[in-house]
Amino acid sequence: MKRFILILAVFLIMPYGIAANENPIEIGTVTWGRDLDKALKLSGQTGRPVFLLFQEVPGCSGCQDFGRTVLSNPRVVEAIESEFLPVRVYNNRGGEDRRLLERFNEPSWNYQVVRFLDSEGRDIIPRKDRVWTVRPLALRMVETLQAVGRPVPDSLRALAEESPLGR
């Protein structure tokens, strides 16, 4: 039964994500979704919050560093992919990306911003920018999971506690 549930979960999540090895450096090695509405619906079904990344691609050196160091950290990637529904929005493109920037009142050509959303698309914790390193991001992930009453994995809690504040 566990195997069936795992296979079903993979098929539910797979269509909204892309392979991490196709990622630009700015978005790290996370397997990202691009369909926020699908992620919100899945959030309602699973209880997992949406991890919504607004990122400049191609981006400046700061955006590239965030992707290379934070969003490629294996422990961060594991926590994002197992505890959240990751969706990326390019903050320097038109179309659906532009529509989402406007919906969330996010500026164009800005440094990365991560928002944590419930199944209705509301912020679970207040928006915060200048979260550019592992520990502050891990702390916000812990805060989000606690706010929605989900268990915080020991590995994520350890990452939030042990990482130097700057990395």
Language model: regions and residue ranges:
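Structural micro-motif
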Residues: 48-49, 100-115
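Thiol-based oxidoreductase modules, predominantly thioredoxin-like and allied folds used
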Residues: 30-34, 55-56, 69-97
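Local sequence-structure signature of Cys/Sec-based thiol-disulfide redox active-site neighborhoods
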Residues: 36-76
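Solvent-exposed loop/turn segments at secondary-structure junctions
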Residues: 57-60, 91-95, 121-123, 131-132
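N-terminal leader/targeting and pre-domain segments
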Residues: 21-46, 160-162
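Sec-dependent N-terminal signal peptides
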Residues: 4-13
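Non-catalytic, surface beta->alpha helical segment in thiol-disulfide oxidoreductase systems
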Residues: 69-71, 108-152
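C-terminal segment of classical bacterial N-terminal signal peptides
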Residues: 13-19
